[in-house]
Each structure stands twice: as C-alpha cells, then as structure tokens.
Amino acid sequence: MTPMSTAQQRVDANAKVTGMQRYGTERAPDGLAFAAFAVATIGKGRVISVDTDAAWKVPGVQQVMTHIDPDELRSPGFIMGGGYGFQSRQPLVDDHIAYRGQPIALIVADTLLAATEAAELITATYEPEPLAVTLDAPDAETVVQSDAIPIPMFADTVAGDADAAFAAAPVQVDVEFHGPTQHHVPMELISSVVEWHGDTLVVHEGTQNSGAIQNGVALQLGIDPSRVEVISESVGGGFGQKNSLQPHIGPLAIAARRLGRAVKLVLTRPQTFHQASFRPASRQRVRLGADASGRLLAAIHEVDQQTSRHDLFPALYTEVSSRLYGIGDFRGRERLVRTDTQTPGFMRAPFEHISVYALESAVDEIAYATGQDPVAIRLANDTTQDPVTGLPFSSRHVAECLRRGAERFGWADRNPEPRSMRAPDGTLIGYGVAIGAYPGDAAPAIAKLSADAGGTISVAVAGHEMGQGIRTAITRLVANDLGIEPAAVEVSVGDTRRAPQHLTAGSWGTTTALPAVHAALRELRSRLGLPETGAVDLHAAVTTTGSPRVDVEATTVAPGQPADVVDQLRKGLVAIAGPEYPGFVTFSYIAHFAEVRVEPTTGRIRVPRVVSVADCGRVASPVTAASQVRGGVVWGVGATLREQSRVDTRYGGFLNSTMEEYPIPVNADIHQIDVDFVDEPDPLLNPVGVKGLGEVAMVGVSAAIGNAVFHATGTRFRRLPIHIEDVLAHL
C-alpha cells in the first residue's frame, strides 16, 4: 500500500472556514415548528401537578406535552446494558423526578421565541425527597462493581499478589486523588430536527451514534428500524456526550407525528449540563511499591466513581493502570456510588485521563523517593509483555516516545531539585513528564464503494465526522491506494441510509473504518481485474466493464470477532473488541513533557510549552492527527487547571452550567504545543497498521502538568483542578 505520511489539508477545511459545512440541525424544512423543555427545579421526588394554563396562552403554541403513555414511548435501555440511550430513564412517562433539570413538559410552537416563553411559564408542585449528589453524601449508595456487574469486562484486575509485594517493598507510596465532575461543553449544542415522511421518521442530528438513534427510537416507538433514517453529516464536537440516543428524540418524534410538521429542538447550554452525560466524580487510592533503584514491584489501585440511581455506569480505570508498566503484582478494584443525577458517561479519555493522572503522579513520587530521573524510571519499568494476560503487545513504542520527547523538550537542562529553577523575574519554573496509554479497540464495519466511468469514487462506511478528520483519513487512503486525486473521492459517514452505523468513540473510529475501506478497495481491484497495488485509471477500468458504475461492498470485523458480530452492528448495538485479542494486546501510547511557570505572588500557573510524542501506529492523516494531539493537550490543560462542574448539594444539579461560569482554556491560556509521531505501523491490529489517537492524546497531560507544578513549587496537588488558592496556600 502507498505510504500515507505525506501532508494534506483537511478535505473539509474550505467548507469549515467559509461556513459552508452543514451540521445536524442547520436545516429548515417547510412548516418547521420549534420545541423547548420545561424542567424540574428539585433534585429528587415526585411531580404532584403541572400548571400549563399560562403556556397555552402564548400565541403560536401548538402542543404542551406533560405525560406520554409508557406504551407509546418505551425506555431505550442503557447503552452499557445492551440498550441505546445514554441512560435507561425516559422522562415524561411518569411522575418520578430522578435529578434536577429533568424535563417535565415539552412545548412545541410556531417560533422558538414562543416555545421558550411558554416553557418558562410552566410551573409545577413537587413532593421533594432527600438527595445525594456527591460521593460522600450520607444517602449515596456504594456497590462493588465486580459484584453488581458480574461480567469479565468489569471484574477486578488482579495479577500476582500485590498486597504481599507492596508490604515487602522497601519504598512505598500511598496516596489519594480526587477527580471532579466535568462537562463536555461542545461548541454545537445537543439538537435535533425530526420529521415524518409518510411512515418514515427522518432524524437530523449531530451525533456519534446514528445507529443507536435509528434502532433505539424504533424500539421506543414500536416501529421497524427500516422506517427510521438518521443523517449526521458533521458533528460540532461530541467528545462522548453525543455517543447515544438522547432522551428528547422519542418525545420529539411523537410531537412531530401528532402535529404533522417537522420539529426542531436545541437544548440550551444549562440543559446540556443537566439532560446529558458528564464525567463523573472519582476518588482514587494508589499504592506503589518499589525497590531502592525505582523498579516498580507492586501496585494497588482502588477507585470510587459516581453513577446514577437508575443505571450503573461501569468504570475501567484499572485497565490502563495495570498495563502502563511491567508491574507483575497488581490489584485493582472499582466501586460505583449511586447518586441523584442523570447517568454520567464517557468524556474524552473517560477513565484513562484521571486514572493516569493518579498513577503517573505516584510514579513521580517514587522517582523522587528513590533519587531517580523521572524519564529514566519510566524507561526502566517499560515492558513488551502485558502483565495481566502475559501476551505480547502488538506494538509498544512508548520508550521511543519518551526518548524523542526528552530530546525535543530539552529535558537534560532540568535541575532535578524542586523550586530550583526560576525565570529572571522570579517566576518559578517546573518541568514534568508523564506517559499515557489507551486501549486499542476496534469494531465491525461495512464499507461500500462505487466507482464510476467519470473517474470518481464514492465511499460509504460506518463512522461520524466530529472534527477528528475521519473523512480526510478515508479520502487519503482511497486516493493513495488508487493513485487518484483526493477531489475525486466522496465520503459519506453518519448516514444510516448509506451504510450501517456503529458508535464512533473510544478512538476506534479510524481503526474500524479504514480496514473496511481497505478491504473494499481490494474487492474493487479484483472486480476490475486490476493488480493488488499501483495507480488505477478508473475511467478506463470501469468503462471496460460495460457499466457506467461498479459497486462493491466489504465487511470487516476486529481480530478474533465472529462473523455474526455484524448483526450487532446492524442493530445499532455496541460491538467492540479489544484491547485483548487472540495472541496479543493493543494500546496506543504517548509521552507528554510540560513546562509550567508559577507566579510566586499570585499562584497563577501558566503552561508555556508542551511536547507530545505519540505512538498511534501508522499516521493516517498527519495534519488532522497533529490537530488531535494539540486538542488533547488543550483538553488536558483545561482539566488540570480550569474545569470543574460545581454541584448544588442542597437542590441538586450543577451551579456553573454556562460557558461564562464553566471555565475552559482560551487562546491566551494555550501556548506552544510541539507534536511528533513515532509513525510505526501495527500490522497485527489491522492491515492498514493504524491505532487510535484522539483519546490517548489527552491521557497523561494532567500528570505531566501536575508533576511540573511539584517541580516548580515543591508541593503535590492531588485534587483536580489545581486552583490558584491551592497553590497560594503552599507558596
């Protein structure tokens, strides 16, 4: 196959910068009506009554729905329990309030202004109940995950005898870390346009999972999935919050059917904080044992993670912490804490970000306790074999990431003594390093290619364009394979009319779509009687067949998956495999080096530069891959120094649910981000040699920054985000 390392801009770059790129709800069908929600103002209890009189008096109001018969709108089921929704609970079907901000009425009107005004006029009386919204609340209920969800994927992680090895270790670290609730805050709000074309429901939405919407809303409404079409041309940021069926789509479909008009709903920013998933709060205890040289002998990793009352959102923190180093004695356990919130969910590097923050901070403490260089201790504890299964890694170039990153960063210039490096103005300077890993998962896919006599080729495959550049990666693969111009390639993703759609998340989008397209290209060459490789004259090849167009289709599954797993794909269910495969284990890796500057009088932390070197297999699209890493670093800066969703312990919900009050990094916070890649293909995972990148890009950033803050100040901060007042208290 032709190398894919030459640079090329995004295929959708021009459309994005000129405003021509169409997102989910950027359409206005004839007769479009607008919807808005009225929401609960208590955190738990029952609705006694809802007063809609004032809402009905607003000119233009067409519908006010406060209750839908459960037979008309069923639960979609929880995505992590074999269902389709981000949570199993479906609002508007009973009088129970499970969390603050839960919808209690859906208003549909001729204009957005009328719908919004009517929603604000709806009042309700409640019967409130005591609530728990934090890990330590008296009414929160804690369950052991391996007992509550007795399937291997969510079992305790055990290798060797970690307790005995830790007790015998001459150097020990025993520390606790706290991760906050956080929200995704994508630029594009959660929104939908739904309309009925006869008996067919058409949904336009920016989503990461068109297949779940298609099959999930069909289940809810009791219709065949073939009568539901979902189109998601582009997504204005997802990051995990848009990876499932949202609870508003079913009610919206019913409203559109009753009204006989298309209906559009755009959640407000505060509603995205209360009606969609979020990163749950967590508490981690990490115990590391080492010998005097810094060789890691034992690790014990115990986690408490927030979940909702109605669903158990499973935790996978120890999947990565058990495999980041060659620690033969490891014990990991996750516990879930039921609270009165909507169900939390996946947010970029959902478990790995905070898990590695804890582990890599503890490793840094071991380095200082043993007098070892933080880079050297990581290199010394590297491994080529998975310590959990004993299987080899399909590829692991984390040592190369560390060596290359250290050279690019200038790590040799670091004075190891904390508080020893200062700028001429007295600003404290700190250097920090951390590595990260993310499981190399993959899913089944069906790719359809159509080559025409005009020399163009269209591709339809499972995937969603959320800005990560999947269209560009697919275009590059096809153009390079056939030796044609990228402009001759048209790519369709996110459209259930064109191909079955699987969830795009967990960095398996590229590792799923590209192998399927690669297989379809092999089928196309065979059909056209062409050699396995080399440039193709599509016009001549197609014309020779006597048809104006040649269509081919290829189905691929992840290594070790049975062929019938494709049935799960067609049903819109999650069907991933990994990181354990027959004969090998796969992860992506990264090394981050961070410089921080801490102002000694104010405690303000700045991050003037970060160097990140990634091992993601073959780099499918250098331009978009580098953007993915830069974006992950920006996310890491925000998670470390800015982002926290403040909970209201009295009434439930989140207090800072707007972009004004939920601080994310702005341009002035972000400086130099130097990105590099190992760019070594991983042929065991798939024939294209690609591994995931979008998630691992964030993993380890917080630890690198936190370790740099320690180097600058001499103080460890084990609670994220690190606030100015925390730093000031120790300067």
Predicted regions and their residues:
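C-terminal catalytic domains of large/alpha subunits in multi-subunit enzymes
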Residues: 67-68, 222-227, 257-263, 292, ...
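Thiamine diphosphate
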Residues: 234, 238-260, 264-266, 470, ...
